[in-house]
Amino acid sequence: MALEKEEKSQIINGYQIHETDTGSPEVQVALLTERINQLIEHLRVHTHDHHSRRGLLKLVGRRRRLLNYLQSKDRERYRNVINRLGLRR
C-alpha cells in the first residue's frame, strides 16, 4: 500500500513550493491523495478488508484536517491544491 520511492519523489517534485520542500501542506495532501486512491482500488477488489477500510478513513480524515488548515491560512493555495488534485469541496 505504501508509495514507491520514485512515485513519492515524483509527487513531491510536482507540489513542492521550493527546492527542499517535502513537508508543506500541499505536498502532504498530494501524497495522502495518492495513498487514498491506491487504497480505494485495493478495496474495490478486496471488499471485506475492513482493516484497510479503517486505514482509509483515517487517511481521509488526516487529509481533511490538512485541507482545513490550508484553507484557514491561505485560501489561494487551498484552491490551487483542490483544483490540481481534482478534489471536490
Curated annotation (Swiss-Prot):
Which molecular-function annotations from GO does this UniProt entry contain? rRNA binding; structural constituent of ribosome
Alphabetical keyword list: Ribonucleoprotein, Ribosomal protein, RNA-binding, rRNA-binding
Keyword Transmembrane found: no
One GO term of the biological process aspect: translation
Q: Which GO terms describe its cellular component?
A: cytosolic small ribosomal subunit
Q: Which InterPro entries match?
A: Ribosomal_uS15, Ribosomal_uS15_bac-type, uS15_NS1_RNA-bd_sf
Q: What family is this? A: Belongs to the universal ribosomal protein uS15 family.
Described function: One of the primary rRNA binding proteins, it binds directly to 16S rRNA where it helps nucleate assembly of the platform of the 30S subunit by binding and bridging several RNA helices of the 16S rRNA.
Q: How does it assemble?
A: Part of the 30S ribosomal subunit. Forms a bridge to the 50S subunit in the 70S ribosome, contacting the 23S rRNA.
Please give the name of this protein.
Small ribosomal subunit protein uS15
State the species of origin.
Chloroflexus aurantiacus (strain ATCC 29366 / DSM 635 / J-10-fl)
